[in-house]
């Protein structure tokens, strides 16, 4: 009648329903049942009984739960009549691009708005170098970004595969800007690279699709 869950490294989420609880590695499987979640930090322990939830540290110290509300539409995580998710995402690309730009570019194309980075624009302007990190197709997106940033912003750019970046000793300066790209916001190697960049005092910006994901919470700003 008791379930114990602990986090170390990989993400862990507790869904809070009415006299019921859910455990998952991210929020998407939970949203069908509840939009109230608790994100555990490393070394947090969740002790779950039928109608009771306790959060503790490894030292058995109690933790006050911080319940967050998910801003996810269940329709976004269903296949929508397609045979599989990859096919759905391929055919959704035109509408996805339009939705990405909607509300961010003025009607006359004279200005661009990114609310998630407004407070750090002075640091971005003062940056001497940009480091883009990601895995898989996120890394490929970073390679495209490299051409655009260097052509239009005239800013030196390095694109790094997160799983390689985290295991060497990269030279990172405080005036560097690190952009972490991840569709899920939970890519383990990218998360580790983010933490390495923050240890070296670099400003980290996250680009991901999932609000409330680990990357969206651990970066300094996000898009």
What residues fall within each predicted segment?
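N-terminal segments that mediate ammonia production and transfer
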Residues: 1-124, 138, 147-152, 165-171
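Glycine-rich phosphate-binding loops that contact phosphosugars or nucleotide phosphates
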Residues: 125-223
């Amino acid at each position: 009648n008791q379930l114990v869950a602990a986090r170390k490294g990989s993400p862990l989420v507790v869904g809070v329903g009415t006299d019921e609880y859910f455990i998952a590695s991210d929020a998407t499987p939970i949203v069908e049942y509840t939009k109230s979640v608790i994100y555990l930090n490393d070394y947090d322990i969740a002790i779950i009984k039928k109608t009771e939830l306790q959060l503790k540290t490894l030292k058995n110290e109690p933790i006050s739960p911080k319940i967050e509300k998910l801003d996810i539409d269940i329709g976004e995580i269903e296949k929508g009549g397609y045979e599989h998710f990859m096919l759905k995402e391929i055919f959704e690309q035109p509408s996805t691009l339009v939705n990405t730009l909607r509300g961010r570019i003025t009607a006359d194309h004279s200005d661009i708005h990114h609310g998630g980075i407004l407070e750090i624009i002075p640091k971005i302007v003062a940056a001497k170098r940009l480091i883009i990190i990601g895995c898989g197709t996120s890394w490929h997106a970073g390679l495209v970004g490299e051409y655009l940033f260097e052509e239009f912003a005239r800013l030196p750019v390095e694109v790094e595969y997160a799983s390689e970046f985290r295991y060497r000793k990269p030279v990172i300066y405080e005036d560097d800007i690190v952009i972490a790209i991840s569709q899920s916001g939970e890519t383990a190697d990218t998360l580790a690279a983010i933490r390495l960049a923050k240890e070296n005092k670099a400003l980290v910006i996250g680009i991901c699709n999932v609000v409330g994901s680990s990357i969206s919470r651990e970066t300094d700003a996000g898009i």
